[in-house]
A protein has these predicted regions:
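Phosphate- and divalent-cation-binding pockets in alpha/beta enzyme and binding domains
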Residues: 63, 112-115, 157
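Short beta-strands and strand-loop turn motifs
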Residues: 1, 147-151
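C-terminal helical cap/extension that packs against the catalytic core
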Residues: 89-144
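Residue-level preference for the first positions of well-ordered beta-strands
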Residues: 74-76, 143-147
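A structural signal for short, well-ordered beta-strand elements
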Residues: 20, 122-125, 157
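Glycine/aspartate-rich loop-and-adjacent alpha/beta segment that forms the canonical ThDP
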Residues: 151-177
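Nucleotide phosphate-binding/pyrophosphate-handling subdomain across enzymes
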Residues: 1-101
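Short glycine-rich anion-binding loops that position phosphate/pyrophosphate groups of nucleotides
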Residues: 82-84, 109, 151-155
């Protein structure tokens, strides 16, 4: 009877291990197939060796900083939009400290941020998103990544963050190819 119980226990453990392997395979497949939400660090494509990401939903400085730090080999960050009068000190400090990134500022909040860090060689100003993407295509070296992460609202320039993100993607496809 003891041998029979041992045999049953071993069979149960084998089934358990097989079930675990199946679960792990299913999880890995789900992770590989997972597509994030649109405009949340959404991968746009790779052109001339540069990866482009759309984080248009980013409307605060912390989101732009997190985007820059979370994308491997991020080199260029496009920031700016409607100036709501929020405090950009955290982002200004980040720009000053992190010379490994190029920042392209646009629109009203970008103009204000650029005014605070204009003496930094890693920060330039562009009038609008079209100019910002053109500059990013020229500035971002192959092997690097470019992120639209505005740290500002889209209103006054776009209907919403979705339209801003779609416009960014359109410019990337047009200029980067």
């Amino acid at each position: 009877l003891t041998e029979l119980m041992k045999c049953q226990k071993m069979q149960q453990q084998e089934v358990s291990v097989q079930d675990t392997d199946a679960v792990i395979e299913a999880v890995l497949k789900s992770m590989a197939d997972f597509e994030g939400l649109p405009h949340r660090l959404q991968y746009v494509g790779t052109y001339r060796g540069v990866r482009y990401y759309d984080d248009s939903i980013s409307t605060i400085p912390e989101a732009a900083i997190n985007a820059a730090m979370s994308i491997p080999d991020a080199k260029t960050v496009l920031i700016g939009g409607m100036d709501r009068g929020i405090n950009y000190d955290l982002l200004v400090t980040f720009i000053r400290k992190h010379k490994e990134f190029q920042f392209i500022c646009a629109y009203a909040s970008g103009k204000r941020i650029f005014g605070e860090v204009g003496d930094c060689e890693n920060c330039v100003y562009a009038e609008d998103l079209e100019q910002a993407v053109e500059a990013a295509v020229q500035m971002t070296e192959p092997g690097g990544a470019c992120i639209l992460s505005p740290a500002a609202a889209s209103y006054g320039y776009f209907k919403n963050f979705e339209e801003r993100g779609e416009t960014f993607q359109k410019y990337v496809h047009a200029f980067a190819q």
